[in-house]
A protein has these predicted regions:
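Cyclophilin-like peptidyl-prolyl cis-trans isomerases
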Residues: 16-232
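Bacterial Sec-dependent N-terminal signal peptides
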Residues: 1-25
Length: 232
């Protein structure tokens, strides 16, 4: 009888200790472990820039190298009124490279022909849209030196670069804007850089040039460059 009482007491003691052990050491479920492991924030790595932020100090060197590997020379501007196809001149390599670079980076998409002077020019590439301004900032702030001694004249239908609004010294050229002549404008020779000509769509240039404008030569109705693409 003594032995039975001893055995019963022993089993009771073991059972109590086992319950206490379970209470003190709760199980950690697999899902909780996985949750803890996955709770760390994913590290976001920003992609490296494909090109440097352009400045007046590095732009010419950049385009000298860029033009070696980007030989495209025919582009298309899709406008509110239709397409304008342009042949870029190989001799004005910095301006050709700049134009190709800007097209590949979608800088002209959504801009406007913001200045129209009847019988003279249509000027494009600008906009008051904040998205356009942001894209410009992402490219950089730089100027291109004029390249006016290649023998190209301001015949009807050439594409040329206006002097810069940033600094007008030496007629440095604004890289984000351009104009197309609607008629012969030889008084511009030697002052602005001709770097291409319209090969198809002069009727579209004429149509844009005929639009009504305000006192500042800005078209009353917006004329968009919906898209600029490379065709060859």
């Amino acid at each position: 009888m003594k032995n039975l009482l001893f055995l019963f007491s022993f089993l009771l003691l073991v059972n109590c200790e086992d319950k206490q052990s379970k209470q003190q050491n709760p199980k950690v479920s697999k899902s909780k472990i996985e949750k803890k492991i996955g709770s760390k924030k994913d590290t976001i790595i920003k992609p490296e820039r494909e090109f440097p932020l352009l400045t007046s100090e590095n732009a010419m060197d950049f385009f000298l190298e860029y033009e070696k590997y980007n030989k495209e020379s025919k582009v298309r501007l899709t406008t509110t009124f239709g397409n304008i196809d342009i042949q870029l001149f190989e001799k004005t390599k910095f301006h050709r490279a700049n134009f190709i670079f800007l097209i590949k980076n979608k800088i002209f998409d959504g801009t406007q022909f913001h200045r129209v002077v009847k019988g003279f020019i249509i000027q494009g590439g600008n906009s008051d849209d904040r998205k356009v301004l942001k894209k410009r900032r992402d490219i950089g702030k730089y100027l291109l030196s004029p390249d006016t001694k290649r023998g190209f004249k301001h015949h009807r239908g050439v594409i040329s670069v206006p002097s810069s609004d940033i600094e007008n010294a030496y007629k440095l050229a604004s890289p984000f804007e351009f104009f197309i002549t609607q008629s012969n404008q030889y008084h511009l020779d030697g002052k602005y850089t001709v770097f291409g000509k319209v090969i198809k769509g002069m009727n579209i240039v004429d149509k844009i040039n005929a639009q009504e404008t305000d006192n500042g030569d800005w078209p009353v109705h917006n004329i968009y460059i919906k898209e600029a693409i490379i065709i060859e």
